[in-house]
Amino acid sequence: MVLAELNWLYGQPEATGILKASPEDFIVCEDLGFSPDGEGEHLMVHIRKTGCNTQFVADSLARFAGIPSRSVSYAGLKDRHAVTEQWFCLHLPGKQEPDFASFQLEGCEILTTARQKRKLRIGALKGNSFTLILREISHHQLVENRLRLIQQGGVPNYFGEQRFGRDGQNLIQAQRWANNEIRVKERSKRSFYLSASRSAMFNAVASARIALKQQQQVIKGDALQLTGRGSWFVADETELPLLQQRVIDGELQITAPLPGDGELGTQHQAADFERQYLQPYESLWELIKRERVEGCRRAILVQPQNLSWQWQDNDTVKISFWLPAGSFATSVVREIINQDQNNVTNIVE
């Protein structure tokens, strides 16, 4: 199921607009949730980059430092068509810190460096702060109304277009792999294809719950998550009224699956519901099981934190917010304006 087919929380937006008329209209600042140690065999490098692919920057840092590309890590991929600030981690055991004054890469600026004891691993961040500018908005008041709704009720926690690659190629190739039409040897491609498969399955289940307006209605066997935590527990039928109130109060969140080679995590009615909407992905799920990917859960909704906006003129609005790691700003924008799909392709790294 492509993003255009997923259900909206507040209905498809009537207002149109443009995101990313230029990279400066999409600013991302990584929030690791911790500060570097100040000592250790790893060197943390904080970079501001414009129009640069994350892996390309990592490879450039590796060449400059004279180390293998595998010795440079980062917490996550960032959008290419954007201005992004993120940390890279160079493993330099017993080596002097390179003189970054002579490091030159178009579109990149080194902000600071610091030593670190441990490697920076994928996913090791708290979240990201976003500052976006939406232009050529067709209906000022409709966008204003949407922003107020989102401030109160959040948005679907869908995986965005970036997860599926340009023109959905990651998911297309995953399906070919699942059908034994191709062999995938490259580790990074295997990871991208499996991730796209699981993301599509999550989106399908989350969209189905939203279509039935059950995104915040606890049903028997639901897997519930403490807000902001990764672990979950199964809703006991005897406690449904209490659990329902905790969901309404924002203490708990209803989740959908990122399937793996084990059980979904739900039971009874909720498990039956999820299996129904995962059935079209049976071959991809078999691939995921074969590759022994560990399953997990993800909240169906996400609440943008510190959401604020300022109208620069009647058809241009600047929006700022913070999202936890793994959530997509483009899924927030999707609830605000109806974008031309030709513009959406500029979002994919």
Curated annotation (Swiss-Prot):
Annotated binding of substrate, by residue: F26, N128, F328
Secretion signal, residue range per the UniProt entry: none
Keyword annotations of the record: Isomerase, tRNA processing
Catalytic site positions: D79
Reactions this protein catalyses: uridine(13) in tRNA = pseudouridine(13) in tRNA
GO cellular component term of the entry, any: cytosol
All residue ranges annotated as the TRUD domain in the record: 154-302
GO biological process assignments: tRNA pseudouridine synthesis
Broad EC category: isomerase
One GO MF term: RNA binding
Cited InterPro entries: PsdUridine_synth_cat_dom_sf, PsdUridine_synth_TruD, PsdUridine_synth_TruD_CS, PsdUridine_synth_TruD_insert, TruD_catalytic, TruD_insert_sf, TruD_pseudoU_synthase
Matching Gene3D superfamilies: TruD, catalytic domain, TruD, insertion domain
Keyword Signal: no
Its EC number(s): 5.4.99.27
A Pfam short name: TruD
Entry-linked NCBIfam families: PRK00984.1-4, tRNA_TruD_broad
Similarity comment: family membership: Belongs to the pseudouridine synthase TruD family.
PANTHER family, per database record: TRNA PSEUDOURIDINE SYNTHASE D (PTHR47811:SF1)
Name recorded for this polypeptide: tRNA pseudouridine synthase D
Source organism of this protein record: Photorhabdus laumondii subsp. laumondii (strain DSM 15139 / CIP 105565 / TT01)
